[in-house]
UniProtKB/Swiss-Prot annotation:
Keywords: Chloroplast, Plastid. It comes from Pyropia yezoensis. The gene is ycf91. This is Uncharacterized protein ycf91. It is found in: Plastid, Chloroplast. GO terms for cellular component: chloroplast. Its main location: plastid.
Length: 117
């Protein structure tokens, strides 16, 4: 892949090109947050993404918070704003959530099935 990208660049652009290790990190396990997790689904009829956040309170009881929106950007904004009032998620979990939201939006746009990793 590095060579094919290299062919597309102009000479003055090549000085910015850096080789990136091609290790497959997709198989690494995600450490779940201690106090919450998210289930993402899509509704093709309404063209929206649905998120259910499961949270644990101090006593260990679980409760759900629902989010619904048309795009990954819209939902990310809502969740980030809402997190100020709720449990804080880790950076790794936030990145994972963003990736999954983009996958779900792409599934909506392409009218495909969405499967959460």
């Amino acid at each position: 892949m590095y060579q094919s990208i290299n062919k597309l660049l102009l000479q003055h652009q090549k000085k910015y090109l850096r080789y990136v290790d091609t290790t497959d990190y997709s198989s690494e396990n995600l450490d779940l947050d201690q106090f919450s997790y998210f289930i993402i689904t899509i509704n093709k009829t309404d063209k929206c993404i649905l998120i259910e956040q499961f949270c644990y309170n101090a006593e260990g009881h679980i409760y759900s918070i629902f989010f619904k929106g048309p795009t990954a950007k819209h939902l990310s904004s809502i969740i980030c704003h809402f997190q100020q009032l709720n449990t804080i998620i880790s950076t790794a979990h936030a990145i994972y959530l963003g990736r999954e939201l983009m996958k779900s939006e792409l599934a909506l746009v392409l009218d495909q099935q969405y499967i959460q990793d």
